[in-house]
Swiss-Prot record:
Superkingdom to which the source organism belongs: Bacteria
Ligand binding (NAD(+)): D66, G67, N137, D138, R148, R165, D167, T178, A179, Y180, S181, M182, S183
Homology family: Belongs to the NAD kinase family.
Its EC number(s): 2.7.1.23
Reactions catalysed according to its record: NAD(+) + ATP = ADP + NADP(+) + H(+)
Protein name: NAD kinase
GO molecular function terms listed in the Swiss-Prot or TrEMBL record: ATP binding; metal ion binding; NAD binding; NAD+ kinase activity
One GO BP: NADP biosynthetic process
Principal location: cytoplasm
Uppermost EC category: transferase
InterPro entries documented for this protein: ATP-NAD_kinase_N, ATP-NAD_kinase_PpnK-typ_C, NAD/diacylglycerol_kinase_sf, NADK
Entry GO CC: cytoplasm
Subcellular location: Cytoplasm
Length: 281
């Protein structure tokens, strides 16, 4: 068994936790390798580029917040990911720092279960060549620095859904429904639901609402504007600047993410705890 470790190097607490984990693994003679920057910051000689970890490791450990886990998920493909929350919110990273070592020990002993989360794939043609980007949470197309309100044209399986005059459009998985989409007024969706939600950002339309659709649908998005360049973001990372009328096709990815589950917590508890439900202001 070999473990790939990815650390949020901007947090000293995550770096300290990674060093503690490395000592623990060394004592048990468990093979591991750090992502290159994580190795540099923790002082480890066990290092590999993030792009190579998936071929070298059997599982991943993400030490940080949900952002670190999203970064890890871009490279983990179907390998199990143990998410340790050293961030603030931690919807995806299931384990606290105190739970880390027992969780890793159970995993090494084969005593664990998996939460499989579906992903989105955004595809487009650039100079005749296809490009594809994956997202666990969401794909966002926004107006960026464009000075006016563009129209975002959305089609479902080739049929026109609507033209949205807005600052942008969020296409989120059920996993991503508690992220940017929720902040923009989208619904919270149970993570195993086979749906995606389309949420407009600050629409200049009184009657527009987020819409939940089957994740088997193919979603086409283009921007109707005379000029400008429009950011395409996947899980918060800029992937491309889109030209007006350029079409992005978003659909369910054939690759899913396998998160190691924390058996001591359930989804309803997470919602109550993270969103402060049931507490007086």
């Amino acid at each position: 068994m070999s473990l790939g470790i990815v650390v949020n190097v901007s947090r000293q607490s995550a770096i300290d936790l990674a060093r503690r984990l490395a000592r623990w693994l060394d004592e048990r003679k468990v093979d591991y390798v750090f992502e290159s920057l994580s190795a540099e910051k923790t002082g480890s000689h066990r290092s590999a580029p993030i792009e190579e970890l998936n071929t070298q490791c059997d599982a991943f450990i993400s030490l940080g917040g949900d952002g670190t886990l999203l970064f890890t998920s871009q490279h983990s493909v179907t390998k199990p990911v143990i998410g340790v929350n050293v961030g603030r919110l931690g919807f995806l990273a299931e384990f606290s720092p105190e739970e880390m070592l027992p969780a890793v020990e159970r995993f090494l002993n084969g005593d664990y279960s998996i939460h499989t989360r579906s992903q989105l794939e955004a595809g487009l043609l650039t100079n005749g060549s296809p490009e594809h980007f994956r997202a666990l949470n969401d794909v966002v197309i926004e107006k960026g620095t464009y000075p006016r309100i563009p129209a975002f044209i959305i089609k479902l399986d080739g049929e026109l859904l609507s033209s949205y005059r807005a600052d942008g459009i969020i296409i989120a998985t059920s996993t991503g429904s508690t992220a940017y989409s929720m902040s923009a007024g989208g619904p919270i969706i149970a993570p195993k639901s086979s749906v995606v939600v389309i949420t407009p950002i600050c629409p200049h339309m009184l009657t527009v609402r987020p819409i939940v659709i089957s994740d088997e649908k193919s979603i086409e998005v283009s921007v109707d504007a005379p000029d400008g360049a429009f950011p395409l973001n996947c899980d918060g990372h800029l992937r491309k600047m889109l030209a007006p009328q350029e079409v992005v096709t978003i659909k369910k990815s054939s690759q899913s993410i396998n998160l190691v589950a924390n058996s001591s917590r359930d989804y309803c508890e997470v919602l109550r705890t993270k969103l402060l439900w049931g507490r007086e202001a």
